Design a protein with these regions (language model features):
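Small beta-barrel nucleic-acid-binding modules, primarily SNase/OB-fold domains
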Residues: 2-9, 13-173
Length: 173
């Protein structure tokens, strides 16, 4: 009896864990997604309906509750604006994410496409994310163009997302 319970428990745990493992081990996942933040999405695999949370590799967007300052000194939530921009970009579209990896924080990262366009670069080009030099220098040129055109976050005064996160950690201690 105890043995049967043990086997049943293991089977349930495997069933709960398996979709995440299988999604991460795949080379490519296509499906619809929802924006969780300006650089993170939850992708639903078209094939097996599993879901995986993916941060767009090589970019960094303001966090939710990260405020920016307008030229007139008004504070606005740039994290929400960045999330809404990503949400509008991916709405009702099928994404394909490839090159899955885990960064040093354990977050799953990927390069994602909307058709033949790289979503990661689209977000930086729109000005709602920055090149995340800790991972890649691929988007530095695109970031510079967005910054000079004052697109997205570049029209405001703000802390770089990684600096803002460090400050939040220090304040929480």
């Amino acid at each position: 009896m105890a043995n049967r319970f043990f086997i049943s428990t293991i089977a349930v745990l495997v069933a709960l864990i398996f979709p995440r493992i299988s999604a991460f081990s795949q080379d490519e996942i296509s499906g619809r997604a929802i924006a969780i933040s300006g650089d993170t999405l939850r992708l639903k695999n078209e094939e097996d309906k599993s879901e995986i949370e993916v941060r767009l590799w090589g970019i960094d967007a303001p966090e939710t509750n990260q405020h920016c300052e307008t030229r007139t000194g008004r504070s606005i939530d740039c994290g929400i604006l960045a999330k809404n921009a990503l949400k509008a970009t991916i709405r009702r579209k099928t994404l394909t994410c490839v090159d899955f990896d885990k960064n040093e924080e354990g977050t799953i990262t990927a390069l994602c496409y909307l058709g033949d366009k790289i979503l990661n670069s689209m977000v930086v080009r729109s000005g709602w994310a920055m090149a995340y030099k800790k991972e890649s220098s691929d988007y530095l040129g695109i970031e510079k163009v967005a910054r000079l055109a004052e697109k997205g976050i570049w029209q405001y005064r703000f802390d770089k997302p990684w600096i803002w996160r460090q400050r939040q950690k220090k304040q929480a201690q």
